[in-house]
A protein has these predicted regions:
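N-terminal glycine-rich FAD/FM-binding segment characteristic of electron-transfer flavoproteins
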Residues: 1-309
């Protein structure tokens, strides 16, 4: 039994989610190979070779994979998948873009966002916004699976010595073209990788008031997130959204400010190690999952908290 893990990267840095995906592969058992598809991605291949538990790294260095267009990457994965029992990718934007296409090309079902491995063919995944856990069993010859990174502790990024093999790509499918992107730059940690996250909700009242959270976050070395209500109200951009339809986070510390705790939001942060809730409504659902709760005016509590940090 050999498992293919799709590396998550940007041609410069190997994403931490890859380490969680390898952990899921180790739980399944068998040899683990990692595919690095990109352009000028040799350094990523070397980094992947250092991951604990990886036996081989396949590097497909081709301009067609520079921007991770799924129309180009998915055929490569599908072609390689025929030699593997399982294909795993992190449940990121890329992973969710690649693997449904791969599953369709292989004519198998895809299993989404697993959080635990029961056996080589049986997995657990959240349903109903995380309120229930489904145990699913696959009879497919090749199991195509996305992995929720927060469900598995990352393996060590060093300690391995896997062989690195250069492979030929499948080229440009000619079905799409990369036009451009606008990346928001921030000195704060990336939301899904941060050890501390400070999130604001509708209780912030407007986008200007998020300055209180930015100030606190900078003192804590934290990332800043938001509830869907805050995003829908136009307070902050949607790349800050935490929740079922946003980003799934599980930091060491999650501070929810002015967030009532809608089920969709809880699905995205309830696995955080320590949850602190600040809300004026003592009946807010967020307090049901919080380890510590502060009931009061956030515009008084947050500045006071910042002074104490």
């Amino acid at each position: 039994m050999t498992i293919l893990v799709i590396a998550e990267h940007n041609n410069a840095v190997l994403a931490a989610a890859t380490l969680n995906t390898v952990a899921a592969a180790k739980a399944i058992g068998g040899d683990i190979h990692v595919l690095v598809a990109g352009s000028g991605c040799g350094a990523i291949g070397e980094a992947a070779a250092q991951i604990e538990g990886v036996a081989k790294v396949l590097v497909a260095d081709d301009a067609a994979y520079a921007n991770q267009l799924p129309e180009n990457v998915a055929p490569l994965i599908a072609d390689l998948a025929k030699s593997y029992s399982h294909v795993l990718a992190a449940a990121t934007t890329n992973g969710k873009n690649f693997l449904p296409r791969v599953a369709a090309q292989l004519d198998v079902d895809q299993i989404s966002e697993i959080i635990a491995v029961e056996s080589a063919d049986t997995f657990k995944r959240p349903i109903y916004a995380g309120n229930a856990i489904a145990t699913v069993q696959s009879s497919a010859a090749i199991k195509v699976i996305t992995v929720r990174a927060t469900g598995f502790d990352a393996v060590n990024a060093t300690g391995g010595s896997a062989a690195v093999e250069q492979i030929s790509g499948t080229g440009d499918a000619g079905k799409s073209a990369f036009v451009g992107e606008e990346l928001a730059k921030s000195d704060r940690p990336e939301l899904t990788a941060a050890k501390i996250v400070v999130s604001g909700g509708r209780g912030m009242q407007n986008g200007e008031n998020f300055k209180h959270l930015y100030s606190l976050a900078d003192k804590l070395g934290a990332a800043v997130g938001a509830s869907r209500a805050a995003v829908d109200a136009g307070f902050v951009p949607n790349d800050m959204q935490v929740g079922q339809t946003g980003k799934i986070v599980a930091p060491q510390l999650y501070i929810a400010v002015g967030i009532s705790g809608a089920i969709q939001h809880l699905a995205g942060m309830k696995d955080s190690k320590v949850i602190v809730a600040i809300n004026k409504d003592e009946e807010a659902p967020i307090f049901q999952v919080a380890d510590y709760g502060l009931v009061g005016d956030l515009f008084e509590i947050v500045p006071e908290l910042e002074k104490l940090v």
